[in-house]
């Protein structure tokens, strides 16, 4: 049956495209902003208790596992240098139906992360200025995120570079103060100690359990793939950016947690280990440093908010260009700013829901989508290279396209086992809604709309 709807939308030279302007360092900074480096302080008390004082060992183990998935992303972006991330990879490596469900599930993560950052900003600023109504902070913060993302992705990248450097600077000062404290007899009393990695109290199972928690700190390194169509030579630049984002993020997490663990060998000093950040800053640097440190956490949310707002706008753009969502709205690119302007505004409207959500419910929304994306990216490598392209003849092929994605998938499987029941329930409800919408698309078009772009893949050698 003939259908007039644009199921396979050919690239149209006259259409406004996203502006290709990002450099490698800008993409990496966007990725680090998405990771929010200072989250290491939020989880330290919890993970230190679970791992018996070996938080950096848990981060090291988590980084090793995450890198397998990062490598899978790198392989796929060379083949499909487009902005859809896991949605595009599953769509083209497995089939459009699976791709749609992966994209729909990923939206749960991408769409609500800007709102969570707005919610955190509201919490921080309301604590500092209790006389100001919370809605003022929500509206102001959303306006800033939306305006910056409307104007230019370069503007967002430059802001994020500044904000990430501010976070790293305050962490360097923190480490300096820790070293001073260690020389004065605090903690283990010396910088030259491997106790945070290995000691008589180190046991593999507690460290692995800690790793399953800190692994969630790495969620978002894949968001840089949504910037592929705004990065010249994306097939070569984006794989580097993915790997560097994961590695640099891991180095920051490991370094910060190492010095913290030397200063706090156990959690006995914390009144509330589950929310130890204010106490950590107070014990290490005093009241003034604590105030500065807490202000920097606001910068943390601003950086992550800008990056996540940009990422979800690009994912919606690709799904709109595919006509999975109405192309006239979601596939629109502003002719002057060269940004997906309507998507940016819609994400801003969703972020206003921070007025009504609490933090526990909001955070439960995001992990499901990220794990779906990670799982199917690893499966896509296997299906595209090993199965479909027949790259299964040599031991090298088996290593790159079977063993490595399998290890990546197993690592993600550990995270699935440790996913909170609330996240799983909300995720399954969201996936059910996506399944119903997919059924509607199939009934209407007889197949899922698919973009037939003009991107040329780079051979995997």
Swiss-Prot record:
Pathway: Amine and polyamine degradation; putrescine degradation. Putrescine uptake is inhibited by carbonyl cyanide m-chlorophenylhydrazone (CCCP), which dissipates the proton motive force. GO terms for molecular function: putrescine transmembrane transporter activity; solute:proton symporter activity. Keywords: Amino-acid transport, Cell inner membrane, Cell membrane, Membrane, Symport, Transmembrane, Transmembrane helix, Transport. Induction: Repressed by PuuR. The chain crosses the membrane at residues 27-47, 54-74, 100-120, 125-145, 162-182, 204-224, 242-262, 275-295, 344-364, 365-385, 399-419, 422-442. GO terms for biological process: amino acid transport; DNA damage response; putrescine catabolic process; putrescine transport. It catalyses: putrescine(in) + H(+)(in) = putrescine(out) + H(+)(out). Disruption phenotype: No visible growth phenotype, no change in extracellular putrescine levels, if the putrescine export operon sapBCDF is also deleted growth is slower. Gene3D superfamilies: Amino acid/polyamine transporter I (1.20.1740.10). GO terms for cellular component: plasma membrane. It is a multi-pass membrane protein. Disulfide bonds: none annotated. It is found in: Cell inner membrane. InterPro entries: AA-permease/SLC12A_dom (IPR004841), APC_superfamily (IPR050367). Involved in the uptake of putrescine. Imports putrescine for its utilization as an energy source in the absence of glucose. Belongs to the amino acid-polyamine-organocation (APC) superfamily. This is Putrescine importer PuuP. It comes from Escherichia coli (strain K12).
